Regions:
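Hydrophobic alpha-helical transmembrane segments in multi-pass integral membrane proteins
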Residues: 9-20, 176-189, 238-248
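C-terminal transmembrane helix end/exit motif
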Residues: 183-187, 198-257, 262-264
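Specific pore-lining/lateral-gate transmembrane helices of multi-pass inner-membrane transport
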Residues: 42-124
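Hydrophobic faces of transmembrane alpha-helices in multi-pass small-molecule transporters and flippases
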Residues: 1-16, 98, 102-107, 111, ...
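Alpha-helical transmembrane segments
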Residues: 127-131, 149-165, 213-223
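Short runs within selected transmembrane alpha-helices of multi-pass transporters and secretion channels
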Residues: 113-118, 135-160, 166-177, 193-209
């Protein structure tokens, strides 16, 4: 459920600045009497988000695979009844790999952001994009850089099933993007377009980093003490629906033996 809400709120937070600026009387344009868009803002936002592709590629192809190896070894030491020294050694290796690969990905993306910053400004001016939009593109590039790092931090939290932390950072991200951009459109005016998105992302990234750091530094507590002492079956709405449709006996999927029948009491 947390992953679903994260996806919804993250996607909504990304598009909120665009949707809010579409309502601007000076920048918003109506197409065919129905659709709204803001040509200047949408164009530079699209090009700014293209700059995030290198980070996403390096994360999936390189960083995530290297991190997963240490992540797997850490939990193998736990589930295979390794002693404390084994678990602690795997934890230190995992944490070191995580921070090292995260720093490497940020440095790699920063080079491309600088490249887009230097070349993009010239290219946009060459194709006769307005100066205000070109200046906004520079700010949006840094905001998108923060978006990329924020997204990676969210994925790492998902690895550890840190649902509370994941929801916290996503709600903060969504509310800041909505609130600051509404304030920018209603109070600050056109000069704030793009900058409010940058501020929202900077604060969201700082908060997400703090949440991840606090979790990683206390990961043994969350893994061992954060679990319930006795298993309690979570009954969701799908289970309730199955009860109504099939009665007290439903088919369940066993992890090893396939389907079997169990009585729901």
């Amino acid at each position: 459920m947390a992953a679903f809400l994260y996806a919804i709120l993250f996607s909504g937070g990304i598009f909120l600045p665009n949707i809010i600026i579409w309502t601007s009387p000076s920048w918003g344009v109506t197409v065919a009497g129905t659709y709204r868009y803001a040509p200047l803002y949408d164009i530079v936002t699209f090009y700014a988000f293209l700059s995030m592709l290198p980070m996403m590629i390096i994360f999936v192809v390189y960083m995530e695979t290297r991190f997963y190896e240490t992540y797997f070894n850490y939990f193998q030491a736990i589930t295979r009844k390794g002693n404390f020294n084994d678990i602690e050694a795997m934890r230190k290796t995992m944490v070191h790999t995580l921070w090292f690969e995260l720093r490497s990905s940020m440095e790699f993306q920063f080079l491309f952001t600088i490249l887009f910053l230097s070349c993009g400004t010239y290219i946009l001016s060459w194709v006769h994009i307005e100066t205000q939009a070109v200046n906004m593109f520079d700010v949006l590039l840094m905001a998108v850089y923060f978006v990329g790092v924020f997204q990676i931090l969210g994925v790492i939290l998902e690895y550890f099933n840190a649902q509370r932390q994941l929801l916290r950072i996503t709600v903060v991200f969504f509310l800041l993007n909505g609130g600051l951009n509404i304030f920018g459109v209603l109070v600050l005016g056109e000069s704030s377009y793009g900058f409010t998105f940058f501020i929202a992302m900077a604060i969201s990234l700082f908060y997400a980093w703090k949440q991840l750091y606090a979790y990683i530094m206390n990961i043994n507590y969350y893994i061992f003490c954060g679990q319930p002492m006795f298993y309690q079956q979570h009954i969701g709405w799908l289970t309730l629906l199955a009860r109504r449709m099939y009665g007290p006996t439903v088919d369940c999927l066993d992890k090893e033996d396939g389907f079997y029948e169990t009585e729901i009491k």
